[in-house]
A protein has these predicted regions:
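All-alpha RGS (Regulator of G-protein Signaling) helical domain and cognate RGS-like helical scaffolds
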Residues: 25-229
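Bacterial N-terminal signal peptides
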Residues: 10-21
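Bacterial N-terminal signal peptides that target proteins for export
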Residues: 2-12
Length: 229
């Protein structure tokens, strides 16, 4: 009995010693796989399989010029004695619309369509001859300010700049939302995943900003009305 117990204890000691002297293994997480160039290419090809139309290309190309004018208007705010609230709004517009221009330019380039520069000018459809069915006449995008309106805004300072900026940007944003409505009202257009999300975001964001600017304009006009002469 005692010899049997001693045998069991001896075996247990040997096992413990083996565990204590064994090399310590540290669990390591497997490194994340790096996508191969071919996998990236396949993913990009998959993203291009969504159908797109002439109306989609026109929308993205036209919105680049449309956004560009809003950026020019917003960049005048710091140099034209704008109200702090207008300065904050202008900064948000610049940041958001510069990013969106990049998205639109990449979308067009990925589909081998002409990529307009970010210039606030009348949208010249003649620069979009790469896709059949384009109307080649120069045209003004909805809501864009005329040369006379832009000159008046650039000449204004202080409260006059605030008023012209807000009224002009409300007009500008309403034009952008009308472009979205036209896109979604065109048969077959707006089905591409990127365009659908982008256009939907433009509609929501700019509709929200229109309401904000209308409140700001009302508050500025009220403040001016009660201010002593």
């Amino acid at each position: 009995m005692h010899s049997h117990l001693r045998s069991i204890l001896a075996i247990a000691c040997v096992c413990c010693a083996a565990v204590l002297t064994a090399p310590q293994m540290v669990a390591q997480s497997a490194p994340l796989p790096t996508p191969s160039p071919s996998a990236v290419a396949r993913a990009r090809a998959d993203s291009l399989r969504y159908p797109y139309t002439v109306a989609d290309v026109q929308f993205m190309s036209g919105m680049i010029g449309h956004h560009s004018q809003a950026i020019v208007m917003s960049k005048w705010a710091p140099t034209h004695a704008a109200d702090p609230a207008v300065l904050r709004l202008a900064e948000r517009i610049i940041n958001a619309q510069e990013d969106e221009i990049g998205t639109m330019q990449r979308w067009l380039g990925d589909r081998l369509q002409p990529v307009p520069e970010a210039k606030p000018m009348s949208h010249d459809m003649a620069g979009m001859s790469g896709m059949a069915g384009m109307d080649h006449a120069p045209m003004m995008m909805p809501g864009m300010l005329t040369d006379a309106q832009m000159k008046a805004l650039n000449a204004a300072h202080g409260a006059d700049f605030d008023r012209l900026f807000l009224t002009g940007m409300i007009q500008h944003h309403k034009g952008a939302t009308s472009m979205v409505s036209t896109l979604f009202g065109t048969t077959g257009a707006g089905q591409d995943e990127t365009i659908f999300k982008f256009a939907s975001d433009v509609n929501v964001d700019q509709t929200t900003e229109i309401a904000r600017m209308q409140r700001m304009l009302f508050e500025f006009e009220l403040k001016r009305a009660v201010a002593p002469d």
